[in-house]
Amino acid sequence: MAEKHDLLDDIIDITNNWGAVSKPVETVMNGISFDPETAPQWDPSKYKERPRPNSVRCLSVASKDPKACTKCQDVCPVNAISITETALTVNESCRKCGLCAAVCPTEAFLIQKLMPKTLYNSIAKQAASHDHVYITCTRALGRIPKENEIVLPCVGALSKELWFSLFMEYDNISVYLPLGVCDRCRTTTGEEAYTDAISYAEELTGAACGLEVDEKALDHEYSRAYKRSQFLGQVARTGTSLVAGHNAAIKGAQAVAQRIQNHTQRVNELTRSLEQAVGVQNSQHHRRMLTQRRELVMAALQKWPEPAKQMKSELPTCDMSKCTMCGDCTEACVLHAIELDRDGKIQIEPAYCVGCGVCARVCKEGALEMHPTDGSALVVPDPHAEEIERERAEVRKLKQQGKKVLDSSLKALGDTFGEDSSSKK
């Protein structure tokens, strides 16, 4: 339902156009003096980057089995990725689409522009300040993007975990792709990649991703809450009249930045809480590693844990009667989620395990098997929330105690008055 337009909204509309009305000559001169040669030019290569493979994080390299995990090769539209027992490589034919980085469970591909946390912050910033934010690709847009248009080499470069984290927080995210744009694209695996990722996130969150196919229908308006916060911040800070011809204040931008900063702090605190609970290192002195995508998912679940039970994954379980303590499984796990403890037993930390199944694949004795599980282990209690709840419980307790004392005092006072009245009679 549309929000009711009130007097403050009218004043904001007037203020936004006041500069052009009060300085007509300057406005006209700016239009006349516009030089297209010095203006920024559309450059699609700016949004593309060849992934840098990190062989240390590759499951197939760590397990010395090139077929242990082939998700990146399966999604690559030009077969540009090679995996051997010693190295993960990307050759010159790479289209820089980013699909490999989106599907790799251990984030073995580094693309600076497409790092999960960086992408999340970029999209969240625009979702918090605009009525709509649009995820699109270089082929679909073909021009310099507006502020609330997030341009990717391919929409499939956004992982399913990132879609999930965004849908849990925002309901104004859409994809902009004109009809037929994917049909003629040489990144032939991109359409299936992004439809699968979005469907996964929609099913878990109950959200609905918007789809826009007409460029004329794109909405670049700031959200009502953002504009009001921005305007009121200007009035409070400068003390000017409501229709003074000044630049818009940054109050709204500060509020958005604070929201992003709070999310980052929540992710960092979650990581620290997890490390305190299970230890930074395992018994082999290897540092356990959380992928950025896993951090974002866990941060969302910490705030809204309901979808965790619907998540489908797998965890390894070990039959110790078959285990020879060879350590092959621990060597294959690049995130160090599995360890052989000091008592000679296999231990798995579910929060760090991505359910790839490579540990079970390399176990020659068949001691490890993968079993279905949900995402309950990814819900880490918020220590601050627990503290706040304890404080609230204490306040409720004190209120009840105070009420009992007050009731007792009033009853005693009533009895006293009753006795006085009886004695006077």
Where are these regions (language model features)?
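Flanking helices and flexible, charged tails adjoining ferredoxin-like Fe-S electron-transfer domains
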Residues: M1-R50, V56, S60-D65, A102-G206, ...
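Ferredoxin-like iron-sulfur electron-transfer modules
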Residues: I14, K23, A39-A68, V78-K96, ...
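A structural signal for short beta-strand/turn segments enriched in small hydrophobics and glycine
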Residues: C72, C76, C100, C104, ...
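Basic (Lys/Arg-enriched) interaction patch that binds polyanionic ligands
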Residues: A87-T106, Y226-V235
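Extracellular/periplasmic ectodomains of large secreted or surface enzymes and adhesion receptors
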Residues: E212-S223, R228, Q258-S273, E386-K397
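N-terminal secretory signal peptides and thylakoid transit peptides that target proteins
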Residues: D219-I250
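C-terminal segment of N-terminal export signals and the immediately downstream linker at the start
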Residues: H246-R288
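C-terminal compact regulatory domains
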Residues: V297-A299
